[in-house]
Amino acid sequence: MCSDFEEETSIQKFKRRLKEEPLIPLGCAATCYALYRAYRSGKAKDSVEMNRMFRARIYAQFFTLLAVVAGGMYYKTERKQRREFEKKVEERKAQEKRDAWLRELEARDKEDKGWKERHAAVSVTAKKETEGAVDKNVNQAPTEEVVEKRGTGILDAVKALVQGKKD
């Protein structure tokens, strides 16, 4: 199945088209050659040869156009199959892109759920901590809170030593 969906590079496509319709590049080359010869004749001031080469250019372009039309009619079914093949390749690419997008969305969804769970757990823990801290402070006097917030300075340490000796 993978071999059905292999894509061709531009060089492979050019070679395939050259093998399918070799008359078109031949007609283009003949047209270019006729134009080159007409240019050279114009530089040489040979108007008869120049007119002859312009007519040859017209014939070469007619040959190229005829090759394009005949090749189009001859390869009509093959081109239709190739379009269907290219359509399948595009559908496969679109499906792969869609699947990758869905996988990315699922990964982000899992990440978001994990983050929400962690955030909820942290919130519950923080709420319990604040409730526990409020319960401990209910039985304490307001002056003790102030002492705790100030911290222990030198004077506080001396007072604690003096009070400790009295007890």
Curated annotation (Swiss-Prot):
Coiled coil ranges: 75-107
Membrane-crossing segments per the record: 21-38, 53-75
A Pfam family that the UniProt record links to this protein: HIG_1_N
Keywords: Coiled coil, Membrane, Mitochondrion, Transmembrane, Transmembrane helix
GO terms, biological process: mitochondrial respirasome assembly
Membrane topology per record: Multi-pass membrane protein
Cell location: Mitochondrion membrane
Limits of the HIG1 domain: 1-86
Listed InterPro entries: Hypoxia_induced_domain, RCF1
GO CC aspect terms: mitochondrial membrane
Similarity field: Belongs to the RCF1 family.
Summary of subunit composition and partner proteins: Associates with the respiratory chain complex III/complex IV supercomplex.
PANTHER family registered for this protein in UniProt: HIG1 DOMAIN FAMILY MEMBER 1A, HYPOXIA-INDUCBILE GENE 1 HIG1 -RELATED
Function of the protein: Cytochrome c oxidase subunit which plays a role in assembly of respiratory supercomplexes.
Protein name: Respiratory supercomplex factor 1-A, mitochondrial
Gene: rcf1-A
